[in-house]
């Protein structure tokens, strides 16, 4: 596993404390009847199956599933883990038994960043979480609210196009430009101003890296939590949490000190809810946690999805040609594509789906946890078992998809399969109670950016590079970013 490869001192610490852990396990061992568990690869003492998880966990788990089946039982240190790698098993977990698997496991990093679990993404399944989720769905991310911010998206996309035009057909770093346009939209919608993007952009990347699965020893070995202090992780997390709080406190104070209706953003909406219902759960820490959810998840996942989509189109000129024909035909005589035009673009929607299928930004859905003992597909699953849905593996399953490793948007034309959580072979936003409520928010940005870029420009690789030279390797992490930046030459279409 990446943490063991990069930090071999962990194994040293493990060996020093073998006696402690064995004593702990002996003292806490209960005489229980043997359970009918799903198939499991061989485990090592203490670390369980951690040694079998490489730097790309989704690929390692897919390879194990090909040998042991779509339901596997693993041990990550002291933590029992159920790995789901088929659409049928995902449907059982996320629909039939959604409530049982609605909890989140403890994450030491998320707990520190999000004020002891006050956000929506990582919070435990409680009445507090249900209230917060309801507020996000009905007040922040409803269709009406998302549509009300159309002018923000259109203004920022106009600026993106201008920046590319100003490159005068020289090499442009499309990765940076996509992060900028996404960050500006998310920041303006969340806190009222795009000027604050630089204040949190670096923090987001640092925190996303620390939230990556397997970063914290404490999460898998509670008795060895102090190792995170020795390795410096706790210090980094504390510093990041302080940076987040300083930034968000400044945003709150700025809003509270402003009279009138200067702001029309998520912070203002949450402050209004707080003022209207003094007995609600909407305290300042809740507001800050929710805003950081929006800033972090929104900026990182949307910009990453955009980068993969444009890289895939450049890599596959036939798909690019078809998309440009559609967009330019619908946009004929127009200087830009509006959101009203997007609903007419069937091939664009197929391209977006195919990009999300082949290049999952979050290949492993955020882990869930069983709230009670359950008989699941004939197996005994105990309360407290983590549940990992390998959505990346499901979306590349050759039993479900024809030639799954190929970029073929046509597979989604005249297909009922979408990304809203009802088709379990395709789960880019998850499903069930814990599914992402920001689907429309994300897709409005994605489609508008891609449509306008392919409408206005023809893209080439710089320095005479060939299409096969375009690196489509992913960097490991909680989100799968492109390993190398997307450098292009954007020539205006005439």
UniProtKB/Swiss-Prot annotation:
The chain crosses the membrane at residues 12-29. Its EC number is 1.14.14.141. Its main location: endoplasmic reticulum. SUPFAM superfamilies: Cytochrome P450. It catalyses: (7S)-marmesin + reduced [NADPH--hemoprotein reductase] + O2 = psoralen + acetone + oxidized [NADPH--hemoprotein reductase] + 2 H2O + H(+). Induction: By fungal elicitor extracted from Phytophthora sojae cell wall. Heme binds at residue 436. It is found in: Endoplasmic reticulum membrane; Microsome membrane. Inhibited by columbianetin. PANTHER family: CYTOCHROME P450 71A2-LIKE, CYTOCHROME P450 FAMILY 71 PROTEIN. Belongs to the cytochrome P450 family. This is Psoralen synthase.
